[in-house]
Amino acid sequence: MLRYSLQARSALRGVRFSSSHSAPKPGSTIPFYINKKPLPTLLYFGTFGVIFSIPFIVVKYHNRNL
């Protein structure tokens, strides 16, 4: 178990270092990030944002009606 977690951590560290070494120029950061992160993860975080924003919208609506 411990060995597996250490291997996973070293693999993550290697990925992080490799991505930081191939950093793009400041002008091309946005397309680089869009190409780097696949669309499903963006949709996943978008749905998370919607789910988190629903309670705030409901609270605002109720406060306006009171």
From Swiss-Prot:
Subcellular compartments: Mitochondrion inner membrane
Keywords: Membrane, Mitochondrion, Mitochondrion inner membrane, Oxidoreductase, Transit peptide, Transmembrane, Transmembrane helix
Chain segments annotated as coiled-coil in the UniProt record: none
GO biological process terms, semicolon-separated: mitochondrial electron transport, cytochrome c to oxygen; proton transmembrane transport
Mitochondrial intermembrane domain ranges by topology: 60-66
InterPro entries: COX7C/Cox8, COX7C/Cox8_sf
Gene3D superfamilies reported for this sequence: Cytochrome c oxidase subunit VIIc (4.10.49.10)
Transmembrane annotation, as ranges: 39-59
One GO term describing the cellular component: mitochondrion
UniProt entry tagged with the keyword Transit peptide: yes
Targeting presequence: 1-17
Topological domains, Mitochondrial matrix: 18-38
Subunit structure: Component of the cytochrome c oxidase (complex IV, CIV), a multisubunit enzyme composed of a catalytic core of 3 subunits and several supernumerary subunits. The complex exists as a monomer or a dimer and forms supercomplexes (SCs) in the inner mitochondrial membrane with ubiquinol-cytochrome c oxidoreductase (cytochrome b-c1 complex, complex III, CIII).
Entry's family note: Belongs to the cytochrome c oxidase VIIc family.
Protein role: Component of the cytochrome c oxidase, the last enzyme in the mitochondrial electron transport chain which drives oxidative phosphorylation. The respiratory chain contains 3 multisubunit complexes succinate dehydrogenase (complex II, CII), ubiquinol-cytochrome c oxidoreductase (cytochrome b-c1 complex, complex III, CIII) and cytochrome c oxidase (complex IV, CIV), that cooperate to transfer electrons derived from NADH and succinate to molecular oxygen, creating an electrochemical gradient over the inner membrane that drives transmembrane transport and the ATP synthase.
Record-given protein name: Cytochrome c oxidase polypeptide VIII, mitochondrial
Organism encoding this protein: Schizosaccharomyces pombe (strain 972 / ATCC 24843)
Source lineage: Eukaryota, Fungi, Dikarya, Ascomycota, Taphrinomycotina
